[in-house]
Amino acid sequence: MTTVRLMSTMRRFGITHEFALRCVGVYLTIRVVGIVILTVFAGLHHTGLTALLSMWDGEWMLGIAQHGYGGIPLWFTDGNGVHTEFTAYAFFPGYPMTVRTVALVPGLSPFAAAMIVNVVAGCLAAVAVGRIGVICSGRIRSSVRSTPDQASTAGLVLVGLFAATPMSVVLNMAYTEAVFCALAGWALVGVLERQWLLAGLCALGAGLVRPTGVAVIAAVMLAAIVARRDGPRAWAAVILAPLGYLGYLAVVWAQTGSATGWFQIQTTGWNTTFDGGAATWRFLTQTLGSGSDFSAIATALLIISVLVLFGWSVADRVPWPVLVYAAAVLASILLSDGLMMSRARLLLPAFVLLIPVAVRIARRPRTEIIAFLAVAALFSGWFGARMLTVFQYAI
């Protein structure tokens, strides 16, 4: 009964059973390639695969899932090596609490629960990404607009590109990216299909998963206000969208006694603060001007590439709610200080900027499409594995 209901729901959004399976198949195939490469690197560096998939922020996520916010052991520290009673509140609760709930199943460890959550969320994200690709490829500027057959292919290509971004390895780690991208993707599907309750609820969820949820909230609220003539459901989306984000900030306020408690924790522990892009500009100029570290140069080039993709998306007239979301993601990351080497990971939710690339690849013969995605999958697997085993600092 549940499967029938799910299929019925997907058909409401123009998603056939066959298309959904293809999206999931493309996604899982590319992610399996990445995991195989990571396994090889783990062996070369005498490290366990489990340790790699749960390192850095993953340790925090699993720690919160196991101990809750109040019971985190003292060895869990912020970016400066400091532990306080409030440090854990830097991490939004959506992902670790979901893992904690799944781990209630007898026999499941928090790590196993996290992997299950990520696989399910990744598959849901893949279907949403595919649908976004189909919709947007048929709504961009007329000179590059896809035919119905090309639109379906463009959606699948977009899924492949999403699964093969340089740091897509985090989709399989105990990180928030898989869950966040699923919620962000379905929120955008809701906006594009004018399904306002779906959009509002997914935005609410995204706001509970990570601070980048403000990008989803902004896109949903603005689109719903513009479409206010759709009636009560549009207004419901406006009300629902920010509740998760604001609710968690209120929880941290209650714990710390400060309305800006969460921001203070971030600034003190990870130097994350709005600076108008000064730190990003400094990183780009210093790295590309005189830097020699491969990982830093690759990250700098990735930042520039994302900005170029944004300009390309604007030129292609990708639907404006999608551009609002992408712009908000970029602004929230590039206009703030913090750990520069985490930018490649944090920019993963800007997958919608790959739409112009997907549309053009979709016009090529099938063999060329498969070859392109195969190369992308291999590069993604290598880059992600290298960042986890060779690069020595947090991502």
Predicted features along the sequence, with ranges:
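Membrane-lumen/periplasm interface segments of specific transmembrane helices
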Residues: 30-48, 53, 217-326
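Short hydrophobic/aromatic helix or loop-helix immediately within or flanking a transmembrane segment
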Residues: 56-107, 276-280
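Loop-to-helix entry region of an early transmembrane alpha helix in multi-pass inner-membrane enzymes
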Residues: 89, 93, 97, 105-127, ...
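Transmembrane-helix motifs of polytopic, lipid-linked glycan transferases
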Residues: 101, 113-140, 305-312
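Transmembrane-helix signature of polytopic, membrane-embedded enzymes
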Residues: 109-112, 130-164, 182, 324
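Multi-pass, polyprenyl lipid-linked donor-dependent membrane glycosyltransferases
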Residues: 117-120, 157-186, 205-216, 343-349
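Membrane-interface transmembrane helices that cradle and orient dolichyl/undecaprenyl
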Residues: 142-152, 187-198, 361
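Membrane-interface alpha helices of multi-pass inner-membrane proteins
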Residues: 163, 170, 184-189, 197-225, ...
